[in-house]
Amino acid sequence: MSFRSILLTALLSLSFTNTMQAAHHHYHRYDDKLRRQYHKKDLPTQENVRKEFCNPYSHSSDPIPLSQQRGVLSPICDLVSECSFLNGISVRSLKQTLKNSAGTQVALDWSILPQWFNPRSSWAPKLSIRDLGYGKPQSLIEADSPCCQTCFNPSAAITIYDSSCGKGVVQVSYTLVRYWRETAALAGQTMMLAGSINDYPARQNIFSQLTFSQTFPNERVNLTVGQYSLYSIDGTLYNNDQQLGFISYALSQNPTATYSSGSLGAYLQVAPTESTCLQVGFQDAYNISGSSIKWNNLTKNKYNFHGYASWAPHCCLGPGQYSVLLYVTRKVPEQMMQTMGWSVNASQYISSKLYVFGRYSGVTGQLSPINRTYSFGLVSPNLLNRNPQDLFGVACAFNNIHASAFQNAQRKYETVIEGFATIGCGPYISFAPDFQLYLYPALRPNKQSARVYSVRANLAI
């Protein structure tokens, strides 16, 4: 059965499914950052939460009054005319003024992540005669602990216009990663792991998003063009961002993913009902790293395709989300193999203080050393009602190692267990001690475990 037939069947079946018209939330990594509210003055009341969940769309056919319509120059004019934040400058008042006057939402995440790891040295696997044609002695791999990472991720969304013809929004997000001392990639080699100890194992610059989105009236259809990444939708609230949730590679993203970190393309998103979301799109196949915007690649006529379906019901326990992502990548010089991948995510609030999630993902081909992963976990937000940033989580991931992609693999599976506790300090700063336990490292047959201790300091505005 071809990928196109599978995708078409899945989308058609979901589009005709009768779902409950109730509270829902479709996860998007950068949209969620822009909407977050950690300041106590911004926290919504229970009544507002109920209204927001139960009426996320305004499906009224009545035209928007002229007094409420926004033209192209409205953001600039409104910002100049309303400078109330100057009476008392603060981060909250500045963000509120930008949102109300200029239709602009901004978010900034800056984290510092030192990680202590053990073991700190190992002997590289001995290459066989079959590999190189001759025997070669083992070499010693050493790394100094800790490795220190800093990650800077600003995001912004600017509403260009909002009228009876629809809404136009420009979104931008950039990720900058730097290291002191050792990198996480070298630390992972020292511990002989198949997966990294964090989401960004080396120095990186990623232009994750630069898009223009046209939302049509009734907000059921959205067309987006520009540079984007599937990482923004492939996951749930706490297993897709190492700055806010879990840190390890297998629990902070899809470890089997072979799609781009950011590439030019377009996608169409449709909401058949209030609790369902369907998306189909394509991207330039050549830009794998997403380090820059490469316009010339669009003329090379090789594209990756994806289909995405999400169902976000609201049951008696609370809101949840269940999604499926299917994608195909083409063979290009930067990625010398065509692949087909999938990712199934499920998350559910059992109560306001307990959130459970799971992921099953996989990929064909020999590009990724991890070709299947099964993960699950639970998170408790603000358990003590002390600070909105407080978060406690524990999760486990079982990674299936692809022997053909990892010639030195000594084991077929590698397991990571992780726990963390985020402690909020005011509305914007938090500290999170984190512990990772790796059982049966894939490349280290003489060791049963490896350990990583981390303390994440994060500024989230």
From Swiss-Prot:
Pfam families from the UniProt entry: OprB
Entry's Gene Ontology cellular component terms: cell outer membrane; pore complex
Protein topology in the membrane: Multi-pass membrane protein
Main localization of the protein described in the UniProt heading: membrane
Protein name as catalogued: Porin AaxA
Signal peptide region: 1-22
Protein keywords: Amino-acid transport, Cell outer membrane, Ion transport, Membrane, Porin, Signal, Transmembrane, Transmembrane beta strand, Transport, Virulence
